[in-house]
Amino acid sequence: MVLVRKIRFEDLDAVTKIEADIFHQPWKYSDFEDMVDKSDRGYVVIELDGRVIGGAAYRNILGDVEITNVELEKEYRGNGYSHILIEEVIKEGKNSGGESFTLEVRKSNLAAIHLYESHGFVTEGVRKGFYDFPKEDALIMWNRNAN
């Protein structure tokens, strides 16, 4: 069974490990801890049969919701779970007063770009050399009409 919900303290070890397995410069335990029970930012986890397999972080800045992290264990990619996460982040972002949504994505991450485009995001800019390991540009994507 799939369940998507807000992060709880008991999820911190799992999401910290997922983050460390995916990113070269992962968030720390304390970064995720700061997402629990906040009104202007949050983190949603996705569980499969009671086990956390991924999540997504967001923060509301004066009505613009920035999606800062989307992560899913590699073996669960390509099964629609990322779509569920994006839908939940948009819902939670709207609940926090968000009107527009933005994110950055590696220019080479075509799977993620297609995911975001399928949820109404369009590329509106580029941050040159934004990412390290390897150095790469970031596309700045926006969804200004989230339904």
Where do the language-model regions lie?
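Conserved hydrophobic beta-strand within the GNAT/NAT acetyltransferase core sheet
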Residues: 67, 101-105
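Conserved acetyl-CoA-binding loop-helix of GNAT-fold acetyltransferases
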Residues: 78-91, 114-118
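Active-site acidic-Proline motif in GNAT/NAT acetyltransferases
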Residues: 73-79, 107-109
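Conserved active-site tyrosine of GNAT-family acetyltransferases
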Residues: 116, 121, 141
